[in-house]
């Protein structure tokens, strides 16, 4: 068994443990966020998702930031912590891969909260486009197709700004990052084997440049798959 395959098996055992315990920690203070940031800066990768409210076409307010580091799921209350004060720089670290699904709006939401540009991203929707030609598959659909697991969609249109959040909202938010790492491990291996990982990385840099450039109008219909489509995958 190769070293990379053995490492993947270790991570997947951790996934099974996390899934069995079904736990999450709620972070609602700068002190807790600072401690968590120190922990997450030591991780090779974390799964990330956001809940937000769009206030206008080009503006949004981040309401919740969900993180899975394989040991635990963290729900960071960005309404109560409205100014992170550089306490979440793991999001901007080159050494920590941030795993998203359909990351365009997540990138915008994090930027609206921090004013900083995330780096070293992986997008499971984009990876699926390069691997199987599925250009806009949703998170629930991908989890069902690849893992045979049904993910709850009941709180998709909830009011994420109102506090306190309900137990149903919290459980839904946690489930949005529960399976991302498992998808990432399989997809990254497949992208490397098919020599497509560079395409994925280049596409994400292209997408980020569109979002953060002040001279480019953000197209709300953009899925971040322009180059993938050009390659006719």
Regions found by a protein language model. Give the residues of each.
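Single conserved hydrophobic/aromatic residue that forms the stacking wall/gate
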Residues: 1-14
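An N-terminal structural lobe/cap that precedes and organizes the functional/catalytic core
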Residues: 51-68
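Small/polar loops that bind or transfer phosphate-bearing groups
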Residues: 2, 28, 101-102
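Short, well-ordered alpha-helix to beta-strand connector turns
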Residues: 7, 43, 94-95
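A common structural microfeature
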Residues: 43-45, 61-64, 73
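N-terminal accessory regions of nucleic-acid-interacting proteins
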Residues: 17-46, 50
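Mixed-charge, glycine-rich, non-catalytic linkers/tails in nucleic-acid processing enzymes
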Residues: 170-233
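Active-site-proximal helix-loop-helix substrate-binding element of RNase H-like nuclease domains
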Residues: 66, 71-86, 90-181, 187-188, ...
């Amino acid at each position: 068994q190769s070293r990379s395959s053995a490492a993947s098996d270790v991570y997947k055992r951790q996934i099974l443990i996390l899934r069995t315990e079904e736990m999450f920690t709620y972070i609602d203070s700068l002190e807790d966020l600072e401690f968590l940031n120190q922990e997450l800066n030591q991780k090779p990768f974390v799964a990330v998702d956001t809940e937000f409210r769009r206030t206008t076409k080009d503006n949004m307010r981040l309401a919740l930031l969900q993180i899975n580091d394989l040991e635990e799921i963290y729900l960071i209350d960005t309404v109560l912590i409205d100014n992170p004060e550089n306490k979440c720089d793991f999001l901007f670290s080159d050494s920590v891969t941030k795993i998203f699904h359909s990351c365009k709006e997540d990138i915008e939401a994090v930027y609206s909260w921090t004013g900083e540009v995330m780096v070293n991203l992986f997008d499971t929707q984009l990876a699926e486009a390069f691997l199987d030609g599925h250009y806009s598959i949703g998170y629930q659909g991908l989890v069902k197709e690849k893992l045979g697991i049904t993910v709850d969609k009941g709180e998709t249109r909830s009011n994420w700004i109102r506090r306190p959040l309900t137990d149903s909202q919290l459980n839904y938010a946690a489930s949005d990052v529960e399976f991302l790492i498992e998808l990432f491990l399989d997809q990254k291996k497949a992208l490397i084997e098919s020599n497509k990982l560079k395409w994925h990385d280049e596409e994400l840099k292209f997408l980020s440049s569109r979002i953060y450039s002040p001279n480019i109008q953000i197209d709300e219909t953009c899925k971040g798959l322009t180059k993938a489509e050009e390659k006719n995958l």
